[in-house]
Amino acid sequence: VLKVGQNLKYDRGILANYDIELRGIAFDTMLESYILDSVAGRHDMDSLSDRWLKHKTITFEEIAGKGKNQLTFNQIALEEAGRYAAEDADVTLQLHLKMWPKLQQNEGPLNVFKNIEMPLVPVLSRVERNGVKIDPAVLHAHSQEIAKRLIELEKKAYDIAGEEFNPVSYTHLRA
């Protein structure tokens, strides 16, 4: 069964806490939004609903409160939680139905979505959950190589400019 969601990387992490692996992820409206308009500002469901559907959603703060007295989802009355969750699912599907046709109009962004962004969802979810092992010796060796290369590039820049300057100074670079 193919699934549509909003911020599925987060959902995968939550479900993993209960040893549930989310499979069949096909579409993520947060990623669709990023690809369609990466500079649009916020890509959370409430903002996307307002932007794409002209619909103001029930916010989590409306049902849970805010600050130190904010309730957790399992403390919210079932009727309120159900209304919130149902709207969340409905809005997510409506967003997908609006954005997906737009994404399909351009092969480049569609390719990024299908072949890069979506396959990365489970990978990044696991990385966030488990971390990444790093070999300190290899990291140190790379750091030394980069530092050496940086010195070489600075010398080359000085030769081109005919004088030494601070390469991280906007004022020096402008002059």
Regions flagged by a language model, labelled:
Residues 1-105, 116, 124:
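Active-site-proximal helix-loop-helix substrate-binding element of RNase H-like nuclease domains
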Residues 73, 119-147:
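Short His/Asp/Glu-rich catalytic/ion-coordination signatures at enzyme active sites or charged loops
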Residues 96, 100, 124-127, 131, ...:
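A structural signal for well-ordered alpha-helices, especially hydrophobic packing surfaces
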Residues 166-167:
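Short, charged alpha-helical motifs in flexible N/C-terminal segments and linkers
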Residues 171-175:
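Conserved small/polar residues in nucleotide/adenosyl-binding loops
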